[in-house]
């Protein structure tokens, strides 16, 4: 088994050193590769039928995708402090995800037991940190073992026309994560992911990059075992000026979600012209088929493998920030559950507007559960289906200000 990483890295290094250009992965060839660093002014172009595939040897992935936090996976294709990077073409980037999983269950794979609970060897597909002027266009990215496209502190990024096709049974298999990033446009993408399809957040490991803002997502089709479009749960800064428009969501455990669990704020977000259907999956996945979900609750204490990074340094518990000025316009949903909007105290979740939101309850009978996880205290709230059926929009609220128009 030949690893092509050295040859690919040499080509990228030379191209960047000579002022930039194109590194071509030619058609009808599978390039098996360990970790590769992408560099400034280089376009990585995959011709149709070319495939770049992750080496299944866990031992070669030694650089953490989260800096000092080694409990959340390793780097495969990555860039740090770069500019003018492009990933293009009709070829495929294959994360070889199943090779890093444990046994197959009903609607998920088990995670392999870790000898060291602070070190997770699963490789992320693309981790791009502090990249200015980034383009990802037309490629197929599939079968990630962990997060797939992670933008950290990036500015002026375009993701257009990609097929991101993860195995729906792989946990933590996020599609696109925008972390402390700004001025990002995502359009015309097809995304299937076991975890969230598109997620905005501000993780504590990268606090130096500031807030996440000025994001537009449009014309995408998504399916998720978790939440198709999510903001949170990690948010130690602010997320604002965000638009999700003209999207379709199918077969997801949750549709549109804001899950604020840290001290950061979420404001001025618009969800518009979205058609979705939600269905219940197992409790392995957060969510109970809520088509719309807006919450702010303090994060639970616990012994999670990265627990030292969940709260501000030196603290063993945290608080949650305000969620306000959130607009849902022209939303149509078929779902096994109603909507949930809640906060830990009055005034925390406010100015939430439902304008022309239509939700039809299907399938589930009897009592329904709303899922507040991850949070301190009880993770589920029980509500009667008959109670929801009486409402124009089936909606449960807790300490939240919502206006239905």
Which role does the model predict for each range below?
Residues 1-405:
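Extracellular/periplasmic carbohydrate-active domains that bind, remodel
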């Amino acid at each position: 088994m030949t690893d092509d990483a050295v040859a690919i890295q040499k080509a990228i290094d030379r191209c960047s050193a000579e002022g930039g250009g194109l590194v071509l992965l030619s058609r009808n060839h599978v390039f098996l590769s360990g970790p590769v660093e992408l560099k400034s002014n280089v376009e990585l172009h995959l011709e149709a039928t070319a495939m770049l595939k992750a080496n299944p040897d866990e031992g070669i992935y030694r650089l953490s995708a989260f800096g000092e936090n080694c409990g959340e996976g390793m780097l495969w294709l990555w860039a740090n402090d770069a500019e003018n990077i492009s990933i293009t073409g009709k070829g495929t980037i294959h994360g070889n995800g199943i090779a890093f999983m444990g046994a197959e269950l009903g609607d998920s794979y088990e995670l392999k037991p870790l000898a060291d609970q602070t070190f997770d060897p699963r490789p992320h597909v693309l981790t791009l940190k502090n990249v200015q002027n980034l383009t990802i266009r037309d490629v197929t990215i599939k079968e990630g073992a962990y997060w797939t496209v992670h933008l950290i502190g990036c500015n002026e990024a375009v993701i257009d026309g990609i097929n991101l096709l993860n195995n729906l049974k792989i946990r933590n298999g996020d599609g696109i994560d925008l972390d402390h990033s700004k001025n990002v446009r995502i359009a015309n993408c097809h995304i299937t992911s076991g975890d969230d399809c598109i997620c905005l957040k501000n993780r504590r490991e990268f606090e130096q990059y500031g807030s996440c803002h000025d994001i537009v997502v449009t014309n995408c089709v998504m399916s998720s075992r978790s939440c198709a479009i999510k903001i949170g749960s990690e948010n130690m800064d602010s997320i604002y000026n965000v638009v999700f428009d003209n999207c379709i969501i199918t077969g997801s455990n949750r549709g549109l979600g804001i899950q604020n669990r840290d001290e950061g704020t979420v404001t001025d977000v618009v969800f518009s012209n979205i058609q979705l259907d939600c269905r219940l999956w197992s409790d392995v996945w957060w969510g109970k088929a809520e088509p719309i979900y807006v919450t702010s609750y303090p994060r639970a204490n616990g012994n999670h493998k990265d627990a030292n990074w969940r709260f501000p340094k030196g603290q063993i518990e945290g608080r949650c920030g305000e969620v306000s000025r959130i607009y849902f316009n022209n939303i149509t949903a078929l779902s096994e559950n109603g909507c949930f909007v809640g906060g830990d105290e009055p005034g925390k979740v406010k100015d939430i507007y439902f304008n022309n939101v239509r939700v039809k309850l299907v399938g589930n009978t009897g009592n329904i559960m709303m899922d507040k996880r991850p949070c301190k205290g009880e993770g589920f709230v029980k509500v009667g289906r008959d109670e929801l059926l009486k409402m124009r929009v089936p909606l449960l609220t807790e300490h939240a200000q919502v206006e239905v128009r």
